Swiss-Prot record:
The kinase domain is likely to have lost catalytic activity but retains ATP-binding activity. ATP structurally stabilizes the kinase domain and promotes stability of binding to PARVA as well as focal adhesion stability. The PH-like region is not required for assembly of the IPP complex or for localization of ILK to focal adhesions. The modification Phosphothreonine is found at residue 173. It comes from Homo sapiens. Mg(2+) binds at residue 339. Residues 33-139 are annotated as: Interaction with LIMS1. The modification N6-acetyllysine is found at residue 426. PANTHER family: INTEGRIN-LINKED PROTEIN KINASE (PTHR44329:SF57), SERINE/THREONINE-PROTEIN KINASE TNNI3K-RELATED (PTHR44329). Gene3D superfamilies: Ankyrin repeat-containing domain, Phosphorylase Kinase, domain 1, Transferase(Phosphotransferase) domain 1. GO terms for biological process: branching involved in ureteric bud morphogenesis; caveola assembly; cell differentiation; cell morphogenesis; cell projection organization; cell-matrix adhesion; establishment or maintenance of epithelial cell apical/basal polarity; fibroblast migration. This is Scaffold protein ILK. It is a peripheral membrane protein. Keywords: Acetylation, ANK repeat, ATP-binding, Cell junction, Cell membrane, Cell projection, Cytoplasm, Cytoskeleton, Magnesium, Membrane, Metal-binding, Nucleotide-binding, Nucleus, Phosphoprotein, Repeat.
Amino acid sequence: MDDIFTQCREGNAVAVRLWLDNTENDLNQGDDHGFSPLHWACREGRSAVVEMLIMRGARINVMNRGDDTPLHLAASHGHRDIVQKLLQYKADINAVNEHGNVPLHYACFWGQDQVAEDLVANGALVSICNKYGEMPVDKAKAPLRELLRERAEKMGQNLNRIPYKDTFWKGTTRTRPRNGTLNKHSGIDFKQLNFLTKLNENHSGELWKGRWQGNDIVVKVLKVRDWSTRKSRDFNEECPRLRIFSHPNVLPVLGACQSPPAPHPTLITHWMPYGSLYNVLHEGTNFVVDQSQAVKFALDMARGMAFLHTLEPLIPRHALNSRSVMIDEDMTARISMADVKFSFQCPGRMYAPAWVAPEALQKKPEDTNRRSADMWSFAVLLWELVTREVPFADLSNMEIGMKVALEGLRPTIPPGISPHVCKLMKICMNEDPAKRPKFDMIVPILEKMQDK
């Protein structure tokens, strides 16, 4: 079968590029052994494919069934250029697999001397023990062993044995490839959905946690008055565009159930354990969003929006705000396609005006530059990330809409905010929509801020 895993193994860059260009393909899916496309390309030394996968957003620290990361495989097989590429993109150099081995264990065992030296030069620990009490240097032949010890000591490493603990990876979440079959089903049998817990209910419908084909999912049941053949046809036509699997910062709609046979039109999407960015910032989840995490979220959102803005035509009726951005298990922010409104859902109503650009509150959608308006929404998200506050929390939606559109109400930037973030916010919130930047222009700015 000439699938993506074979193409990555064989280094067929043209076929891989064509596959990546199809938005319904998920580059972070896994095969039967939990190997992602990146695992295979790293194992087989396919540098061009590795580069392409990383540029398209492949997860660097993804683990297969044996908890090997792509770095474990590249180090074992002595692909020095790929090891350096993975390290450049922040691969976890001391990631532990199911045997307690780190990439350096394998580089030493297989006699990949140069790779072992590179790993130590980048902070790999020479005396971390696996489950069997063996250190990486125990696996190396004598000359390499001495050399690595010497290098590590020069770099300030303590050469005493670090005993194996089952908690080496605690505090990081183990990132698994996604189930590769999920993007194959667009129409879903309503009877196969198992509704577990109701999460939320509002004007547009109900949100449930559920199970489907052994996977945790979120089920969105739409409330639609006077369901008709025409609305049913629109639902069928508009759904497929929301199945975007090809970008790591976009959360696709996995599939839909038409009504009938379902009692209401229904969407399903991946379960996100942390919920939305709104939940994380304002509803006390278990982790702290510090400055570096805030910049990472901003970068994730900017990358996702930059991708969505390349689509022609644009996805209509998509509103960017902190409730429509989901946070994945590995703290990646993803723009949710399940929050896009359908043409038959309350046209002309705004439910989150605090994030909406003034011109979009005043004009019809067809008279607004959507890309510029999205940039304003992004500026409000930046404000929210640095202040941890809900914009205009003391006003009703009606008041916010009126005051932003007609009275010049704007978020006030408090003192003490990083001057870089402050400047970026002001640029993105320019009163003249034509002077706001595009997302592909601010991605490199945020990347620089992240590196600092």
